[in-house]
Design a protein with these regions (language model features):
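Short, glycine/acidic-enriched loop or turn micro-motifs at the edges of active sites
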Residues: 82, 150, 194, 199, ...
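Conserved kinase catalytic-core helix
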Residues: 107-135, 139-140, 156-190, 195, ...
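C-lobe/activation-segment region of protein kinase-like
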Residues: 170, 182-189, 200-258
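Long, low-complexity intrinsically disordered regions enriched in Ser/Thr/Pro/Gly
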Residues: 1-17
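Intrinsic disorder/low-complexity detector
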Residues: 6-7, 29, 36-43, 47-48, ...
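Conserved ATP-binding subdomain of kinase catalytic cores across diverse folds
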Residues: 22, 29-155
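Short small-residue beta-strand/loop micro-motif enriched in glycine and branched aliphatics
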Residues: 154-159, 213-216
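Polybasic/polar functional segments that serve as interface/processing modules
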Residues: 17-18, 22-30, 222
Length: 258
């Protein structure tokens, strides 16, 4: 009964904002997601006409939940970073050393806000150089709105779950993406794997909140880790290049300092 009452109160709050609720039975109240700060950010996005409807959950990650949404006739993805349960230490590793966020206060709320802004910025830089990523639309506090990648209301599958007819071609595209990201966008994804790549009409890199600039103290280490992850996944699926050869071609360095 308490859960149903809380669900009703939550639905009423969203409706008061002017937001239409889709698939209400799938939109379960999660106290660690829809807190007062998140509801306020949602209200601001609805008020500014960025959102008109919210639907069911698309995915639940370590730090964020993603929901299906609508902006008029446009399908969007609503990424909400959880403030109460965010892994402060894990996030700090990627924020500290990033010159763009050197003034961030060391508390959980401000770190999550900075992280959301950071992902928006990283996606924008990647998109500018032609990397296939979800289009970043707007961010507010701990909420990031992006274009929805999928067919109808069904998201594209992660690479690990997709049926790929030509894995060698996909592998080459990914190595090219890593190169372009590093040399043109001056970014390193820093968590690239078969879990953070979607595959539909083409491949897409996602989850770029942790991505760092090329001058980050750990950028080269993260770059090598990305290369190793992609090689690990494709090793039994097609011919691959050696880790160090890819690394050297991208960075023009022969080795990486431990």
């Amino acid at each position: 009964m308490k859960v149903e009452k809380r669900q009703l109160q939550f639905d009423q709050k969203l409706e008061e904002m002017g937001m239409r609720i889709k698939d209400a039975d799938q939109l379960k109240v999660k106290e660690d997601v829809f807190d007062e700060i998140t509801l306020l950010a949602l209200y601001r996005l609805v008020h500014k006409k960025w959102l008109s409807a919210i639907g069911g959950s698309i995915s639940t990650g370590k730090e964020a939940n993603i929901f299906f949404g609508e902006r008029g006739n446009l399908n969007v993805a609503i990424k909400i970073y959880r403030i109460r349960t965010a892994n402060f230490n894990a996030m700090s590793e990627y924020i500290v050393g990033d010159r763009r966020f050197s003034n961030v206060k060391k508390n959980r709320k401000d770190l999550v806000f900075a992280w959301t802004k950071k992902e928006f910025s990283n996606l924008s830089r990647a998109q500018e150089v032609g990397i296939p990523v979800p289009e970043p639309l707007v961010w507010d506090r701990n909420i990031l709105l992006m274009s929805f990648l999928g067919e109808g209301e069904r998201p594209y599958p992660q690479l690990r779950l997709a049926k790929i007819m030509d894995p060698e071609s996909v592998y080459k595209q990914l190595i090219e993406c890593i190169d372009t990201l590093y040399n043109k966008a001056e970014l390193v994804h820093a968590d690239l794997s078969e879990f953070n790549i979607l595959y539909g009409d083409r491949l897409y890199l996602i989850d770029m909140g942790q991505s760092v600039t090329r001058d980050h103290p750990n950028a080269l280490r993260y770059l090598m880790r990305d290369i190793k992850n992609i090689n690990r996944y494709f090793r039994t699926r097609c011919a691959i290049q050696e880790d160090i050869k890819i690394f050297s071609k991208i960075t023009h360095l022969d080795t990486i300092e431990p």
